[in-house]
């Protein structure tokens, strides 16, 4: 959208272009103002047949999944690289128990280059405290209506089998069971899709 273009005009244009949805974020205002704006944008996106993923913190859950199924996910958590900070494994495992209680979250899991200084983000020279398979497993554990992976395409092309695995994930899950876990320590889940 052009700067200062009215929201509804921009969303109507995306619908006309055949877009599936938008990733909306970086809203200004206090939490109450942001949540009011979130509800308005969710309604407008539904009107224009667009899914919406909120890339903003915090977008509080307000029952949107039931009323507005086009609101597929939101960043009601600390996501990877928030404030240029890679989160620790303990943060992930805590979010899996706490933040997902109210619905899907956009946490941006799935790094395949574990030293972020070598990516296009030269300003972030941190190691990702994980493994490649651990990052892929996080995409299964995190319930999200739209899995958003954060790395650059070249790194996914280096692991074609993992990219194929990510592409085959079918959400929403038909069945999800937490087999074992402790907040902040570990989680073991089983997921089943319709197939």
Region roles according to the model:
Residues 133-182:
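Catalytic cores of secreted or luminal carbohydrate-active enzymes
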Residues 117-142, 147, 192-195:
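Long hydrophobic segments that form regular secondary structure
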Residues 182-195:
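Carbohydrate-binding surface patches
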